Curated annotation (Swiss-Prot):
Gene3D superfamilies: 3.40.50.880. The keyword Phosphoprotein does not apply. This is Homoserine O-acetyltransferase. Its main location: cytoplasm. GO terms for biological process: L-methionine biosynthetic process from homoserine via O-succinyl-L-homoserine and cystathionine. The gene is metAA. Disulfide bonds: none annotated. It comes from Lysinibacillus sphaericus (strain C3-41). One of its GO terms (cellular component) is cytoplasm. Keywords: Acyltransferase, Amino-acid biosynthesis, Cytoplasm, Methionine biosynthesis, Transferase.
């Protein structure tokens, strides 16, 4: 089934070239089915790349999906044009009266800062509080995952001595959980971060379930026991070359950075990396949309009534 995107969104052309079924808003209105409404809070600096990565995954399921892109009002993005934000993004005040079937909160390049020192933290915290009643399930990625663990569950982050960057092997703690249904016993996933969280704090928290971890990269997939929040500390959505692009960027800036581990053939940055995590990425997003969003959300679920809105 198609993914419904805003008219003239640049990612649409790339998705069509990849044979992913997309529809623009005008055509989607004629479909006599109830689509899923997904809100994406895109905090990544290169927003158009992240849009394409996420839409590629959301568009590869049997479900019709409507997408709303959300941008922070309290922080001005520097790596995307104002016209792009005006055309394709909205702010929290414009959508807070609505309900959404699912929501994605991306990573952000602010992980070394204490949460309260991030200039849009209060806005992020308000959005996360709002999501408790107005979103069926929220998928948090990298910094977004750490922000959720901190805000909802009181688990702080730990600064690492060196950047965790590369493709790591992971195990599943419980293959019967719907989110990881169909996963292999051992699978790979990319990480790109300077901070982590305590695996013991996650394991011992009464409201959380540790679903996947790596001996080298630590906590990977965490699920709240009420299925409301999914936290993924890595970047399953990354393209094959994203870690290479980040590495080249940091080297050009003169940053003392290690070569991403288990990524380049023979650890040679001159060689083309391969994507070894693509299948599990599609599987996780499909499982999330099916088991945690589609099967859990009410059919009539859109606008918040006035009484609940003011609670």
């Amino acid at each position: 089934m198609p993914i419904n995107i805003p008219k003239n969104l640049p990612a649409g052309e790339h998705l069509r070239e990849e044979k992913i079924f997309v529809m623009e808003e005008d055509r989607a209105r004629t479909q006599q089915i109830r689509p899923l409404n997904i809100l994406i809070l895109n905090l990544m600096p290169e927003k158009e790349k992240t849009e394409l990565q996420l839409l590629r995954l959301l568009g590869n399921t049997p479900l019709q999906v409507n997408i709303t892109f959300l941008n922070t009002a309290t922080h001005e993005s520097k790596n995307v044009s104002k016209s792009h934000l005006q055309l394709f993004y909205t702010t929290f005040n414009q959508i807070r009266h609505r309900r959404y079937d699912g929501m994605i909160i991306t990573g952000a390049p602010v992980e070394k800062m204490p949460f309260e020192e991030v200039n849009y933290w209060q806005e992020i915290a308000e959005i996360m509080d709002w999501s408790k009643k107005n979103v069926t399930s929220v998928l948090h990625i990298c910094w977004g995952a750490q922000a959720a663990l901190y805000h909802h569950y009181g688990i702080g982050k730990i600064e690492l001595s060196a950047k965790c960057s590369g493709v790591y092997s992971h195990v599943i703690t419980d293959l019967t959980v719907d989110l990881v249904r169909g996963f292999s016993d051992l699978f790979t996933a990319p990480h790109s971060r300077y901070t982590s969280v305590s695996i013991d704090e996650v394991r011992n928290h009464p409201d959380l379930r540790l679903l996947s971890y790596s001996e080298d990269a630590g906590v990977f997939i965490v699920q709240s026991k009420d299925n409301k929040n999914i936290m993924i500390t890595g970047h399953l959505e990354y393209d094959a070359t994203t870690l290479a692009d980040e590495y080249s960027r940091d080297v050009a800036k003169g940053i003392d950075i290690n070569v991403p581990v288990n990524y380049f053939p023979n650890d040679d940055p001159e060689k083309e990396p391969m994507n070894t995590w693509r299948a599990h990425t599609h599987l996780l997003f499909s499982n999330w949309l099916n088991y945690y969003v589609y099967q859990e959300t009410p059919y009539e679920w859109d606008f918040v009534d006035e009484i609940e809105y003011h609670i």
